[in-house]
Amino acid sequence: MAGRFDPLTRTTVRGGATRVPAPTPATPNATATGGTAGTGAKTGTGARPRTATGGINGQAATGTAPRTRHYTPPGPLTLGLVLGPLRRGPHDPTFRVTPDGAVWRASQTPAGPGTLRVTARAADGTVTGEAWGPGADWLLDRLPALLGAEDDPAAFVPRHRLVHASHRSRPGLRLTRTGLVLESLIPSVLEQKVTADEAYRAWRILVRQYGTPAPGPAPDRMYAMPDARTWCRIPSWDWHKAGVDSKRSGTILRAARVAPRLEEAAGMDLPEASARLELVPGIGPWTSAETLQRSNGHPDAVTVGDLHLPGIIGFALAGDRTTDDAAMLELLAPYEGQRHRATRLILLAGLTPPRRKPRMPRTDIGRL
């Protein structure tokens, strides 16, 4: 069934399924003029005209022309699958999909905050990136890596019928690499041992309260996450109001204090990168894997210690919903070196065991 439809459930969303509308046809008043497709050229003159009174959805336009880069991927590329894992919930203030088929991201880069707008042209697959803010050049320099240029899908060989069907029906799946460790680490820590909705709410509250408004004509209420110094200055009562307990907030504070050392992991191989992150108390194999899947785009960064994942993998591959981590890793052994990609394809297939017990209850410590 995996190859016949694309379900949108909690499981497939976790696999990175994000629906991106088909791009609207280009018009003379809404086309970028800078750069040459396929060359990776950048220019500061390829502005998409905005209204004088407000950019998109009413946010004030800055009048600053974006930096622009065009990139032609070597094969099929589906923006929703490639960038979907970077979205933390449907109301993530750092990630937005607009009706014109554009994906917007606001990031805190080493050069400062930046906004990136990514669109793909249906005719030839050319991707255009437009960026604003101090981090614009940094974001455009890494646009190909963000879109999976450093990934090698050809190295993956399906070994199960379901995986083969999921793989065949998603030729545009590539593993993103953001090059930003803290950006993926902090929301992963927030997701430790709570429901996804609780973690998304905490991320949304903290980023909107302490983050930087997204530069340029970004959609309303978009923010780049706080920098490391700002994370360290968040008072305990605001963590509490966001529903974050002292264990998770303490882990984030410890990570923020050594942020430069953690960011070095973006250039390391998987074992060294995992070891670097796990030196911080409160960061274990689950959190490091969830982080490095996004920051490093490593195809073998398999998540262990997860409440639901072993049962999903076991049910999909062996019909066993009681699978534990050890049995899951045994089932994934044929995909050694590509276990993260295999896991994503299984999640995207949407085959999950029937629910037998109530959902994990939500707890809002901010009301205490």
Where are these regions (language model features)?
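HhH-family (HhH-GPD) DNA N-glycosylase catalytic core used in base-excision repair
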Residues: 1-35, 39-368
